[in-house]
C-alpha cells in the first residue's frame, strides 16, 4: 500500500524558537512530545493545535489500516526566502527517507499555506486541512484576542506599521496646513505597501535596511552614499509633486512629475549603486556589474525624460527629432555599459 504523509508546516519555526526542538520531527510519539513542550512554552500558539490535529488524522488513517506517517517541518523566524529554503531542504530529506506517495497538509490557516507550492513540487497533495480554533464570542474574550494578536510581532508588522505610516503621512500634511494633500499621500503609501506585499519585496527591503545598518556600524563609505541616495529620492518626489500639483490635465500632470523628477531619481539610483559597489569592494566581491547598471539607469532616465518632454510639448520645434535622438543616445549609453561589463 502506498505510504501517506500527514505533514505539519511551521513556517516561522515556533517549535525551534519557543520549545528548542529541531526539525523535522517524525513519528507520532515524537510529535506528541513536541506539541506538549510547545504548548507548555506558549499555550496560545496555534501550531500546537495544528500538531494535535495532525495526530488525530494520523490515528484515523492508521485505524483504517493505511500506511501513514506524521511529520512536522519547520522553517525559520526570518519568514520568506530563508524559511522557505529550510522547509524545502527538510522536505527533500523527508521524501527521500520515507518515499511517500501523497500528503495531507495540516495548517493553522496563517502564512504556512504560502509553502503549498513547495510541497506540491515534491509530493502529491491529497488534502489541505485547516485548523481553526474556536473562541468564546464574549466582548471580553474578543478584546483579549485582539490584544494578543497585536502583541504578535508578525501581525503587528502587517497591521500596525501601515496604520502608523498613514497617521504619520496625514499629520505631516496637516502641520503643513494642506490636509487635502494628506489623502493623496495616504493613497500613494497604500499603493506602495500593496505592491510590496503583492510581489513579496518585504525581505528585500529588510535586507537593504540591514545593509545600511551594517555600513553605519562598520563605518563604511557606503553609508554616506545610502544617505545621499535617500535625500535625492525625496527631492525627486518633492520636485515632481510641486511641478504637477496645480495641473488639471492628468496626462500633463503625470508628464510634468516625470520630467522634473527623473534626473533626481537617476542620481538617487546612481548613489545607491555606488553604495552597493563600495560594499562589494569592501567584501572583495565583483563591482563591475554595478557600474554597468549605472549606465543602464542613465539610459533609462534619458528615454523617460525625453518622452515626458515630448508629451508636455509635442508642438515644439524638433520635438520628435529630440525624442529620437534621446532614444539613440540611450541605446549607445546602454551598449557602453554592457560592453564595459564584458571587458571587465
Swiss-Prot record:
Pfam families attached to this UniProt entry: DUF373
Membrane-protein topology: Multi-pass membrane protein
Keyword Signal: no
Highest taxon in the source lineage: Archaea
Location of this chain's protein in the cell: Cell membrane
Chief place where the protein resides: membrane
Keywords, sorted A to Z: Cell membrane, Membrane, Transmembrane, Transmembrane helix
Transmembrane segments: 155-175, 181-201, 221-241, 254-274, 291-311, 319-339
GO CC annotation, single: plasma membrane
Keyword Mitochondrion in record: no
Bridged cysteine pairs (disulfide): none
Family of the protein in this entry: To M.jannaschii MJ1032.
Protein name: Uncharacterized protein AF_2058
Organism: Archaeoglobus fulgidus (strain ATCC 49558 / DSM 4304 / JCM 9628 / NBRC 100126 / VC-16)
